[in-house]
């Protein structure tokens, strides 16, 4: 399954409000509170629902943009009228609270909509597209295996598309009755690239990405969702997620930092085994 301009669309309404302003538009909430508040108001109006922002509901991004433009140009009648000049008889107005303050936000959004790299996010898709998307990603019936190809997704949106896809899969499982749940394993290959240790050095989009996978690691088993975390650099993986892993498969390791990290999760008395992992042959594992 390929996501991108030469694959499946990933409509912008899949994104939560925080993904929209923080990841797509790269707006920091603490330094642009007025713009974020205006975007939040337009977001819920366009969705015509006050449901949680993380519940994907179809809306037209062009309508959202029009709502912002209307606020940016709003003038309010004072109740008085011009008595002389060219405007005689016309109502007097004052600028609305947000008049002229949303220009940069609107420009950011319009630039993204015009950028051909993001066409797969702004091609209109109806409300039934989410069901179609999940069916394509999950396949049909037990035993189905799908590889999600993200090579066509712009690098700046890659963490967001990964996080939102994982969140959609997880939420899809939450809505199933216990009798209808089909166990789902999400295989995270080269996981250190998007489930990093990082700490305070993480970007906002990386932090939101981690939040999704930490939730799945902690709560997923209750709803039939498990993670298979694969990495050649285990020392660079998020510790919270690693701590939730019940089973570990260790292949050949040469890096001392990686070996020390693995040693920390093994039972006492197993140091001798770790000393030999750099001698493993292809196919050998612990």
Give residue ranges: language-model regions.
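Conserved ATP-driven motor cores of ASCE-family P-loop NTPases powering translocation/secretion/packaging/pilus
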Residues: 26, 209-210, 214-286
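P-loop NTPase motor domains
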Residues: 1-215
